[in-house]
From Swiss-Prot:
It comes from Prochlorococcus marinus (strain SARG / CCMP1375 / SS120). Residues 19-26 are annotated as: G1. HAMAP family: EF_Tu_B (MF_00118_B). Belongs to the TRAFAC class translation factor GTPase superfamily. Classic translation factor GTPase family. EF-Tu/EF-1A subfamily. GO terms for molecular function: GTP binding; GTPase activity; translation elongation factor activity. This is Elongation factor Tu. Residues 136-139 are annotated as: G4. It is an enzyme of class 3 (hydrolase). It catalyses: GTP + H2O = GDP + phosphate + H(+). It is found in: Cytoplasm.
Length: 399
């Protein structure tokens, strides 16, 4: 049977369910697929299908994640749901599941709990741009005043993490009742998806952003010049265009004289393509793995940054012992290891800590020995002798 072609007739958006353990994230995810399946926009999945999420490896870290897909009238969604709290932390920090927005699930019976707060904070730190709240288990609360109080509490909480608490839609749902086929609650799930359609903005397509390609390999072709290969991360590049070579050494300007993919010559390469770019006037020794080719003037290299980091446990292949300020690991950024130093760190909530234990989540300040094209929101791994001991996301550029 021929493989089904992915139809691109609707804009694609990546979302996920976040929130406290047992507040009903997975049940709600199942309910969404069941309600939309009745309109032919999804394949119905039950709790067990989603809860038995397979393990995945992302940057050397094992994460359990369930992926479901569905459509609404206007969009195609890829939706991630994680079984355990630690999986969320790892998922959001490694960017294994990039989210354009999230559904924050909060049980009306409990109100916001510890992980509700932690997930909102994480969403803020890793740059999830928009949230919609699903106030779940509303079938179990008879008193509308209680629901009103919980809603106020959620809005204040969102405000305290710099999300627009007053504007974020809160939809009262019951994932369980909707899953059981109760039409009133099925209607609420539809209402939730309408809110998601309306308030989670469509992401800017990678191809519309300024060109960037991380260099993976370099070789010279006799009589033609130097070729840099890699996957175009964003934007597009045309033959004859000027690009900058950024990172590790001083920034240089060159012209792309050829774009090649699968041994064929192209007029342009675009986001997602694995290409070889022929560069004018550049010697093989002028460019190396770890540098990036970018649209002229779009990016500057940096050496100092702040990051949110998850440090692997011993069982995950991480360190067995703690580390202290001044620790010098390698930072694996895009395609290369750069030596650097963790000059300072605090616990995730900003309180001071003396040392970092395997399994901790920290905020850290890092300093690299040479300038590299790092950007806010970018993911990196922390390595020691070639093995990953932590994963992070750049939360702020200092210098």
């Amino acid at each position: 049977m021929a493989r089904e072609k992915f139809e691109r007739n609707k804009p694609h958006v990546n979302i996920g369910t976040i929130g406290h353990v047992d507040h009903g994230k997975t049940t709600l995810t199942a309910a969404i697929t069941n309600v939309l399946a009745k309109k032919g926009q999804a394949q119905a999945q039950d709790y067990g299908d989603i809860d038995g999420a397979p393990e995945e490896r992302e940057r050397g870290i094992t994460i359990n994640t369930a992926h479901v897909e569905y459509e609404t009238d206007g969009r195609h969604y890829a939706h991630v749901d994680c079984p355990g709290h630690a999986d969320y932390v790892k998922n959001m920090i490694t960017g294994a599941a990039q989210m354009d927005g999230a559904i924050l699930v909060c049980a009306a019976t409990d109100g916001p709990m510890a992980q509700t707060k932690e997930h909102i904070l994480l969403a803020k730190q890793v740059g999830v741009p928009a949230l919609v709240v699903a106030l779940n288990k509303c079938d179990m609360v008879d008193d509308p005043e209680i629901i009103e109080l919980v809603e106020m509490e959620i809005r204040e909480l969102l405000d305290s993490y710099d999300f627009p608490g007053d504007e974020i839609p809160i939809v009262q749902v019951s994932g369980l009742k909707a899953l059981e086929g109760d039409s009133e609650w099925e209607g609420k799930v539809e209402e939730l998806m309408k809110a998601v359609d309306a308030s989670i903005p469509e992401p800017e397509r990678e191809v519309d952003k300024p060109f960037l390609m991380a260099v993976e390999d370099v070789f010279s072709i006799t009589g033609r010049g130097t070729v840099a290969t890699g996957r175009i991360e964003r934007g597009k590049v045309t033959v004859g265009e000027e690009v900058e070579i950024v990172g590790i050494r001083d920034t240089r300007l060159t012209t792309v004289t050829g774009v090649e993919m699968f041994r064929k010559l192209l007029d342009e390469g675009m986001a997602g393509d694995n290409v070889g770019l022929l560069l004018r006037g550049i010697q093989k020794e002028d460019i190396e793995r770890g540098m990036v080719l970018v649209k002229k003037g779009s990016i500057t290299p940096h050496t100092q940054f702040e990051g949110e980091v998850y440090v692997l446990k011993k069982e995950e292949g991480g360190r067995h012992t703690p580390f202290f300020a001044g620790y010098r690991p390698q930072f694996y950024i895009r395609t290369t290891d750069v030596t650097g130093q963790i000059t300072a760190f605090t616990a995730d909530d900003g309180s001071s800590v003396e040392m970092v234990m395997p399994g901790d989540r920290i905020k850290m300040t890092g300093e690299l020995i040479c300038p590299v094209a790092i950007e806010q929101g970018m993911r990196f791994a922390i390595r020691e002798g070639g093995r990953t001991i932590g994963a992070g996301v750049v939360s702020k550029i200092i210098k």
